[in-house]
């Protein structure tokens, strides 16, 4: 990593819940963890698109936003689960409340992503340095997993763009 003097000033985390809709469904129905599954569309009429998929479906080449018929050609045993948006909103709120334990500067972006500016609260966890920021990121990841069953990618940087790139890289 290249040192930049801006890194001494701000510490931003980008938190991204992995395969959020599919992950919530797998938490609620653990039997879905071991089969290719996706959230989306109407399985009876065979219309609609894939909103999210688990890692097993991803290995078959199933992509977010592709049609159900296309996904089923790639993965005939794909289990399609209808979306439960109210449940996803509850999980999102729970996760954002976890973030508030670390900073009051939480900026949600959609239902499954948030930026956290931890600069002002780092002294509560150690020094104001990159190692402490990584420690906080790990603690948030572990807390979210323990309390919700969901996995989270977290990028750490001195600005939003690089923090987002970091969370994408950590997936």
For each predicted feature, which ranges?
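Gly/Gly-Pro- and Ser/Thr-rich, intrinsically disordered tail segments characteristic of DNA damage-repair
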Residues: 1-171
């Amino acid at each position: 990593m290249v040192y930049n003097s801006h890194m001494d000033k701000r510490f931003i985390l980008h938190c991204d819940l992995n395969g959020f809709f599919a992950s919530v469904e797998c938490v609620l129905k653990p039997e879905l963890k071991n089969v290719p599954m996706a959230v989306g569309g109407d399985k009876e009429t065979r219309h609609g698109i894939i909103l999210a998929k688990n890692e097993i479906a991803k290995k078959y080449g199933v992509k977010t936003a592709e049609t159900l018929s296309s996904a089923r050609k790639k993965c005939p045993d794909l289990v399609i689960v209808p979306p439960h948006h109210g449940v996803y909103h509850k999980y999102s709120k729970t996760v954002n409340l976890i973030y508030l334990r670390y900073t009051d500067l939480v900026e949600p972006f959609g239902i499954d992503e948030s930026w956290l500016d931890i600069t002002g609260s780092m002294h509560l966890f150690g020094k104001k340095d990159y190692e402490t920021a990584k420690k906080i990121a790990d603690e948030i990841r572990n807390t979210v997993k323990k309390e919700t069953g969901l996995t989270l990618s977290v990028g750490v940087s001195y600005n939003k763009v690089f923090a987002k790139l970091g969370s994408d890289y950590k997936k």
